[in-house]
Amino acid sequence: MLSLQTLAKKAVAKQSVPEEYHYILKYCGLWWQNKPISLCHYCNYIILNSTLFKRELLHLDVALIMAIKENNYDVIRLFTEWGANIYYGLTCARTEQTQELCRELGAKDGLNNKEIFIGLLRHKTSNNIILCHEIFNNNPILETLNIQDFGEEIHRELKFFIFYILDNVPINVLVKYWYAIAIKYKLKRAISFFYQTYGHLNMWRLMCAIYFNNIFDLHEIYEQKIAHMDIDEMMQLACMRDYNFSTIYYCFVLGGDIDQAINVSQWHHQTNNICFCKDLKDLKQNVLTARPLLLPNITDPKKIYTMLKNYLPTSSNSR
């Protein structure tokens, strides 16, 4: 059961406190990263207002790991009292005093890197991906990280796309992997987190959106001019993975070479993409007879998703 003091702090953290009273928040321990600690009214999330993150929601479990890496004992206790999971704390504790505090609060001893990595990503959620990132990133305890330990899991998720993340620095591989998983599973908060944290990986975000058929993220990248790639290169990337109808269609509408798309799909033996690209070629030549009909020149991702959700290429039906 939470103490009266803990409940009171939690209640205050959910209020909007005028700046002239911030000194009271500091005195009460409701202060972190030079800002008041703000707690979401309806969920277990901290509202970040740092220079990097503007009004960004961060799960208490993630915030706790960040506090542990900072050796911020008061905040560690506070977040744990509020319900944050201390389970992975010892993996990130950098001093003996922090380690002892984590043990006292219930952290698990003896976890290995693979257990953490596989365990967290068994359920693909924004919180788990960001938490995994915070545990492994900038953590001197994990300097001996061996990327081969995670190779099977990474290959299972990325398949052919794994060749695009090869790097001599293990953490660079993992960051690209987490970003790719966020895009593959359309995890908006995780995508936002990586976009704000790793601005130099905007091209990687574009490539992942295309390859993993995330039409919503692709449209956002294109509309906001976050990254740019030659349209035919985009089309080639879309055709490398079967059933990428949405991103193939989007590239087609933007002017991608449909004959080249057919050739790339054939080269990669993506049968359904071949049939779909042939339908798009028929659409371009106004000879398409499939039902439901493909519509030309749509760039709204919701309309594209609805149009193609149950779409079967004409050529595959005629086999």
Swiss-Prot record:
Induction (free text): Expressed in the early phase of the viral replicative cycle.
Pfam families from the UniProt entry: ASFV_360
Top-level taxon of origin: Viruses
Swiss-Prot/TrEMBL keywords: Early protein
Biological-process GO terms, alphabetical: taxis
Keyword RNA-binding: no
Protein's UniProt keywords contain DNA-binding: no
Function: Plays a role in virus cell tropism, and may be required for efficient virus replication in macrophages.
Family: Belongs to the asfivirus MGF 360 family.
This protein's name: Protein MGF 360-8L
